[in-house]
Structure formats: structure tokens, C-alpha cells
Amino acid sequence: MSERSVSKSREQKRWYSVLAPEQFDRQELGETLAEEPDQVVGRTITTTLGELTGDSGANNTKLTFKITDVGSDTAYTEFIKYELTRDYLRSLVRRGASKVEASITVLTTDDYRIRVQPVALTTKKADRSQEKAIRRVMIDKVHAAAEDRTFESFVDAIVEGNLSSAIYGDAKLIYPLRRVEIQKLTLEARPSEVAAEEETAVDVDADEVAVDADE
């Protein structure tokens, strides 16, 4: 492609300002370039919690947003992932100590399906039964948090450290802990997607019943 063609193509594109959801005060996340608004929808943008809050101590936390709508020259997003940086996670690990992890899928009260991955770091090496008990606390606390929170309030509980503190409070009674973190949260399905999956499951069950009846 000639330089003139590239220049003309770029001139036909426009910049869209990408905003965080209202939950994050509609802060500007950056800009994205496209010829048409529908080319912007579906794109993702990642920033750090530190950049949104002005707290450099939170730069070890990455937040990912997905563009869902465009109005004029503004692109609106939804939150889809919270994740600690690899460097930060590596810095937490100590030789001669235990690292206890869990991966838990739950539904919030407004039917968002999310996967939550907590991690606990002990002061010294815990035995297998203690690690299992700590993991059980993680699972119970995450389920309890989802049972009385919307997706937005669940995300707030993680960003503000409330969920990790709740896990720490109970798990430290099993074995001394140095740290508990939520290393990752991922949005797996929205309410409409969850409902569609449930309808499909019901249809399959109905078909199986019909086959059994024919037999």
C-alpha cells in the first residue's frame, strides 16, 4: 500500500474516547482509532487500579474493560477482569512456605457468572490437611460473598480488599498467614448468557424425557 493510501485511510478514521463504567466514575481509559463505531465495540483496554485511583501502590493490579457501546465520539465499557501482575505475585512467594490457591465459579445476585481465584501465603510450610482447610475457607467465603452481592458490589469487595480480608480473618485461625489476595476475577457470562444456557439445558432435558417416553 502506498504512503498516500495509508495516509488517506488514517484520515478517514476517527478517535474515540474510551470511558470506564459508572462504577469507576466514568474515568477516561484511553483512546481507540476506527473508521466506524461498530468496529470499536468488542475491543478491550487494560489499565491499572493505580492509574484510576492515583495511588501508585495499586499499580500491581490490572483492570480490563470491554467496549460495549459507542455514542458520538465516546466508547462505553463494562468491567470484565481483575488481575494481579505476575511480578507482584512472584514477590509474595517465600521459600519454605505454602501457597494455597483456589478457583471458584459463582453466580452473583443479579446472575453474573464469575470465576474468582484467591491465593493465601503462609508464614511457614503448612501440612496438606491445613492447606485443604484454608482452601475450604476460601470457597465458603467466596460463595457467601456472591450470595448477597450484585456483580458490581462483588467487584467493589475485591478492589477494596474486603473479600481477601474476610478470608484472611478465618483462615489465619487454621495456620499463620502472611498474606491473602484475590489474584484474579474474570467475568464468564452475563445474565442474558446465563439465561440462554439454562434454557438450552432445559430443552435438552425435555428431549431426553421425550425419548425415554417413546421407548
From Swiss-Prot:
GO terms for biological process: translation. Keywords: Ribonucleoprotein, Ribosomal protein. It comes from the Archaea. GO terms for cellular component: ribonucleoprotein complex; ribosome. It holds the Pfam family Ribosomal_S3Ae. GO terms for molecular function: structural constituent of ribosome. InterPro entries: Ribosomal_eS1, Ribosomal_eS1_arc. HAMAP family: Ribosomal_eS1 (MF_00359). Belongs to the eukaryotic ribosomal protein eS1 family. This is Small ribosomal subunit protein eS1. It comes from Halorubrum lacusprofundi (strain ATCC 49239 / DSM 5036 / JCM 8891 / ACAM 34). The lineage of its organism: Archaea, Methanobacteriati, Methanobacteriota, Stenosarchaea group, Halobacteria. The gene is rps3ae.
